[in-house]
Amino acid sequence: MAIRTFRPYTPGTRTRVVTDFSEVTGRKPERSLVVSKHRRKGRNNRGVITCRHRGGGHKRQYRLVDFRRNKHGVTAKVAAIHYDPHRNARLALLFYADGEKRYILAPAGISIGQTVVSGTEVPIEIGNAMPLSAIPLGSSVHCVELYAGRGGQMVRTAGASAQVMAKEGDYVALKLPSTEVRLVRRECFATLGEVGNAEIRNTSLGKAGRRRWLGRRPQVRGSVMNPCDHPHGGGEGRAPIGRSGPVTPWGKPALGLKTRKRNKPSNKFVLRKRRKTSKRSRGGRDS
């Protein structure tokens, strides 16, 4: 996979940077693994907006992805690499020896014709799924289960990977992409390797229209709203917000407020909290 840039023959192509889709081999998705999905548009069952700036965009069909990898001991051959409109990662289409077809997240470095398998005693190769207890220390993994049998819930985005740090008793210590070190049960499954399409972080949409194609609507500043719409709104002209610091549309502090519960039961599994992001790395001024 490579990054493609464009000459500035229009304002929209001046800063446009996209992936060239060279790793995608399948033109159409597998029909048996595609279902229709109702587009929520950021609304709940009563039609109330619960997630702002969502709606519109190109039509999509949901690909059924196998996050459980529960066909233990049955080898599968990678038949194609497909595009998924619902995620940045690519999908690998697997043809199992018993005739079943499934999608999995395509790991970096996987190739057409490669054989993958899941189980408790499988080779240490990219794309194979196995319990964390069977994975060597220092290995990179993705699609990690939080609870055995529930399917991969962590480390699923493009270019992400977690590192196996230590094993002690019934738990395995994982260093997550956020730099947090967390304990996970040793019987939980994970897939070897990192998720492919890591170059997606270097892309740029280039224009507002491409963002609308993805189903993202414009974000309006609170200071230009009315007082009934945002705490920052109102006033004559470009008025200050009138508060000691910026707040959310619901009046809560917007910068630096911790949202995790202090007494959350899973806190005991977090050995080291994630590293805080500095102002310089966020793009702000360094005091």
From Swiss-Prot:
Q: Where is the composition biased (Basic residues)?
A: 258-287
Q: Which domain of life is it from?
A: Bacteria
Keywords annotated in UniProt: Ribonucleoprotein, Ribosomal protein, RNA-binding, rRNA-binding
Q: Gene3D superfamilies under this entry?
A: 2.30.30.30, Nucleic acid-binding proteins, Ribosomal protein L2, domain 3
What's one Pfam family the UniProt record gives for this protein?
A: Ribosomal_L2
Q: Where is this region: Disordered?
A: 221-287
This protein's GO CC annotations: large ribosomal subunit
What InterPro entries does the entry give? NA-bd_OB-fold (IPR012340), Rib_uL2_dom2 (IPR014722), Ribosomal_uL2 (IPR002171), Ribosomal_uL2_bac/org-type (IPR005880), Ribosomal_uL2_C (IPR022669), Ribosomal_uL2_CS (IPR022671), Ribosomal_uL2_dom3 (IPR014726), Ribosomal_uL2_RNA-bd_dom (IPR022666)
The answer on whether this UniProt entry bears the keyword Transcription regulation reads no
**Molecular function (Gene Ontology), one example:** structural constituent of ribosome
User: Which GO BP annotation is one of this protein's?
Assistant: translation
| Keyword Ribonucleoprotein listed | yes
Q: Which HAMAP family match?
A: Ribosomal_uL2_B
Q: How does it assemble?
A: Part of the 50S ribosomal subunit. Forms a bridge to the 30S subunit in the 70S ribosome.
Q: What does this protein do?
A: One of the primary rRNA binding proteins. Required for association of the 30S and 50S subunits to form the 70S ribosome, for tRNA binding and peptide bond formation. It has been suggested to have peptidyltransferase activity; this is somewhat controversial. Makes several contacts with the 16S rRNA in the 70S ribosome.
According to its UniProt record, which protein family does this protein belong to? Belongs to the universal ribosomal protein uL2 family.
Stated name of the protein: Large ribosomal subunit protein uL2
Organism from which the protein derives: Synechococcus sp. (strain CC9311)
The major lineage groups are: Bacteria, Bacillati, Cyanobacteriota, Cyanophyceae, Synechococcales
Q: State the gene name recorded for this protein.
A: rplB
